[in-house]
């Protein structure tokens, strides 16, 4: 096989020269970024000291190079990937303002209660003053909560309508102050009283134990409500990194695509939040990794069972679909037949766990009164399920139309916050990055293993249909012709399967120039850089710019 010079350079820069050169390049890049921010977003006029800005950019650049040097010294791709996840995930942890991940405000309150040793649910119980102050200063969906709309005048004096939707920063008048998330930090730091906050309508414990442990450690170290939030985020990130490490250790075929998904900005954004989606995504990637194994062993079955039961505690019913993979995992045909009994036991166990969690949430609940439906009586689950079964063609039209109008959600992988902060560059680049990972790590195979490929395709399509149907019967009034509430993160397991199949197809159609190890190394480097860039862009959109100008 011929080797292209681009992938196999004849001479490599010695390590004693490479890392100093990398540090200088990173400093130059950080300085260029700071200069761009300073000029394009008028940071001098907004009171940002130039020395502080350039100093922070340089320090961050050196920190990233130092982290890359440490990661390079780790042995094996899974360990290096876990290091990249921790490094880039930490950037997301601090780039994302408090309470901005989907439902993070409720997850924060429940996790804080658990960190105090409270495993029951009492609506009359309130939180400490600093927690209430943080909760009031940072409303969930901050961008939507601070969106302005109305009438203004253009340069010619004509009235025009304006809407600051999708902008985290806005400015009233060319010389007016810029309103941003910094105002919420100042409000929280100013102290003062805040209205009491009661426990949320959220009745689970197990999915919040990791972040509750992080909050407990932060509180023992003397941190307040804000420090507890970051402590919980970092604890979630560590668990996600461990699950991804285990998944990459399992996966021997198609590992490059799995690697790219673990480092996808949207994955890291959720992993570095207080949402239970952090370990939910880790469990998804762990279960999916068994498709890439040469042989599915009993120990693998134990890991699969643990991840499967945990994901069904957090999100029941839809995750029963993961049992389908048991019939397509590698192994002798006789073993696949035996897995039917194993799958039946897991399914019964998942249902038992679901009913126990539901009973626990009711039995230990007090002072909540009657809890109404989120969308009132317009949404009735069983009648809507029967409606879908009686009108399959109508639902198929609603399903396909919703996917089409949203670009099959592949163009929303850069949508952050509570679906209120789009980063268009990441919306465009994320699917391209996944396709690049598939191309870099494809390898020539004489024959495709039909069972894993059939399992990936079947699971991917059924998961998309199942996730959409679940949102239709639980959140969408039956008369609507569009399914509401769908998000790109719901489809990440299905996207993983489809890009894994793309990698297999490219391996059959192309002649890969790089060997498996070289391709995976390049994939790790590109995915890690893309993840770090995603965190920087998230910080920019929340704190620096673009700024919506209201004249």
Annotated model-derived regions:
Residues 254, 334-341, 438-461:
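Membrane-interface helix-loop-helix junctions at transmembrane boundaries of multi-pass membrane enzymes
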Residues 76, 223-226, 245-265:
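Transmembrane-helix signature of polytopic, membrane-embedded enzymes
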Residues 118-229:
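Interfacial juxtamembrane loops and adjacent helix segments
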Residues 273-280:
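Short acidic/glycine- and proline-prone juxtamembrane loop motifs at membrane-interface regions
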Residues 251, 287-303:
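Membrane-interface transmembrane helices that cradle and orient dolichyl/undecaprenyl
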Residues 48, 358-442:
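Membrane-lumen/periplasm interface segments of multi-pass, membrane-embedded glycan/lipid transferases
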Residues 269, 300-316, 320-327, 350:
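Membrane-interface alpha helices of multi-pass inner-membrane proteins
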Residues 29-56, 351-352, 360-371, 513-551:
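Transmembrane helical bundles and short interhelical boundary loops of multi-pass, membrane-embedded
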């Amino acid at each position: 096989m011929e080797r292209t010079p681009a992938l196999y350079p004849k001479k490599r820069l010695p390590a004693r020269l490479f890392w100093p050169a990398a540090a200088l390049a990173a400093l130059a890049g950080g300085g260029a970024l700071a200069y761009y921010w300073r000029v394009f977003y008028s940071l001098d006029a907004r009171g940002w000291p130039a020395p502080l800005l350039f100093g922070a950019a340089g320090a961050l650049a050196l920190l990233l190079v130092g982290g890359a040097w440490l990661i390079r010294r780790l042995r094996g791709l899974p360990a290096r990937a876990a290091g990249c996840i921790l490094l880039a995930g930490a950037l997301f942890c601090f780039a994302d303002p408090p309470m901005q991940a989907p439902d993070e405000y409720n997850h924060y309150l429940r996790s804080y209660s658990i960190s105090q040793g409270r495993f029951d649910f009492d609506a009359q119980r309130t939180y400490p003053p600093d927690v209430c102050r943080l909760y009031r200063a940072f409303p969930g969906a901050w961008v939507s909560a601070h969106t302005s709309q109305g009438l203004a005048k253009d340069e010619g004096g004509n009235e025009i309508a304006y809407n600051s939707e999708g902008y985290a920063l806005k400015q009233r008048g060319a010389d007016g102050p810029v309103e941003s998330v910094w105002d919420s930090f100042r409000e929280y730091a100013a102290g003062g009283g805040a209205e009491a906050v009661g426990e949320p309508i959220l009745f689970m414990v197990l999915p919040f134990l990791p972040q509750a442990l992080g909050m407990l450690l932060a509180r023992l170290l003397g941190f307040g409500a804000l420090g507890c939030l970051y402590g919980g985020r970092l604890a979630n990130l560590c668990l996600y990194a461990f699950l991804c490490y285990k998944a990459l250790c399992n996966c021997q075929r198609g590992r490059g695509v799995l690697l790219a998904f673990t480092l996808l900005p949207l994955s890291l954004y959720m992993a570095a939040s207080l949402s239970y989606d952090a370990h939910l995504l880790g469990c998804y990637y762990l279960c999916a990794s068994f498709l890439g194994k040469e042989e599915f062993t009993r120990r693998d079955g134990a890991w699969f069972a643990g991840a499967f039961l945990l994901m069904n505690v957090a999100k029941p019913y839809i995750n029963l679909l993961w049992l389908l993979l048991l019939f397509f995992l590698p192994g002798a045909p006789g073993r696949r037949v035996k897995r039917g009994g194993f799958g039946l036991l897991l399914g019964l166990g998942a249902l038992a766990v679901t009913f126990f969690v539901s009973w626990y949430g009711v039995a230990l609940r007090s002072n909540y009164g009657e809890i109404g439906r989120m969308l009132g009586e317009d949404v009735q689950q069983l009648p809507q399920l029967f409606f879908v079964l009686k009108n399959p063609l109508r639902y198929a039209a609603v399903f396909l139309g919703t996917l089409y109008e949203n670009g099959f959600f592949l163009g929303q992988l850069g949508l952050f916050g509570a679906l209120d902060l789009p980063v268009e560059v990441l919306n465009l680049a994320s699917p391209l990055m996944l396709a690049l990972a598939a191309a870099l790590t494809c390898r020539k195979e004489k024959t495709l293993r039909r069972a894993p490929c059939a399992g990936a395709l079947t699971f991917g399509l059924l998961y998309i249909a199942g996730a959409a149907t679940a949102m239709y019967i639980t959140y969408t009034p039956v008369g609507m012709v569009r399914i509401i509430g769908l998000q790109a993160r719901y489809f990440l397991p299905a996207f993983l399967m489809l890009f894994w199949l793309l990698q297999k197809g490219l391996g059959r159609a192309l002649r890969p120039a790089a060997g498996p190890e070289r391709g995976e190394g390049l994939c790790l480097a590109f995915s890690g850089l893309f993840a770090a860039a995603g965190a920087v862009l998230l910080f920019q959109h929340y704190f620096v710019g673009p700024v919506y100008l209201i004249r």
